[in-house]
Structure formats: C-alpha cells, structure tokens
C-alpha cells in the first residue's frame, strides 16, 4: 500500500520540460531520520499546496475584482502573498481569522476584502492544521488519520459552498465553473484531487498506525466544518 501510494504521488509531480537538464537532488542528512511513510506525507502535502495555488490562480482569473479588493495589480503578486516564502503568518485583511473562519469570510456579505484570499487561506491553514503545522516529517512524527479524514470532508463542504453560496441579490460570491452548459470543469477536477489526496493519506496513516477512522455521516449542505 505504501509503495503504491508513493508511486502514485510521485507520478503527480510536475515534470521538467525536455530542454531542462535533470538536476540531481543534494543529499540531506535529515533524510536519514525519515521513513518511506514520512516521504509520502511530505509529497502529499507539497502536492496539495500546489493544487491550492492553482485553484487560487483560477479563482483570480474568474474573479478579477477580488485582485482589486486585495490591492494587488497582478495574479503573481496575489499568489506570492498567499504562498510565497515571505508570506505573513497571519494573512492581512482577514481580521486575524484562519481555517474555517476565514472560509466563512469568503461567503459573508458584510466582508469587503479579498474573497479569493479568504477562501484559499482558509483551506491552506486548515490543511496545515491537519498536518500538525509541519512541512517536514520524521520517524517520530505521527499524524492523526481522523484529522486527515475530517480535512477531506471539510474540503467537500468548502467546495460545495463555492458552487452554491449566493448573496442577497442571488449572485455567487465567487465564480468558479461556468453557469452555462459545457462549462469549465477544471475547478471540479482540482477539488476532486485535493479531496482524494487527503482521503488517501488518511488511509495510509491509519493502516500504518493500526488506527481506525470514524466515518461520520453528514450532509454537505449542513455546511458545518469538522474541528481539526
């Protein structure tokens, strides 16, 4: 199971263009303290962050007014504020909110800030909470598979809200897929990948630690996020 998962996640990694030389990865002494499972977790987390960045890019493209709300001039500056190496611990303009509360701002009619940033930062911090706030993992690190399972369910709820939540004038807070027939399904694909990665990771961690995942049945339309 672990080997198959590692192979699947590696296959998801972006490949260099043909004209780009393949560079050997430098040896890192810290890798000695990593198990195969730790490497799977790190790959999964990095890939999830890439998907969130891609989701943010697409949402800004469909909702350019949110760039102006965030006082950004380009997609790149907005994305760097969310994901760049110099990003702030608390994203500005979200009233200090994060995780589920930040996602809630994206669909709050009284919020006049950048709704794309609120939605993405909420997902990003929720993701990091499920991975115990770490981006490197070692043999002694043990994740909670229940948190990862709840993360997948929370992503389902967040994407349901993205597709359905409207303001008092019946307008979507954020435009994602086209409202017309044959619309762009790229948002649906990204949502499916993000949810699927967390479900897969929850199972891998549960199997590796002999822990059971409690499946909680809840209607997505109840829009109550699970605590992580």
Language-model features and meaning:
Residues 13-17, 215-228:
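Long, compositionally biased low-complexity regions that are usually intrinsically disordered
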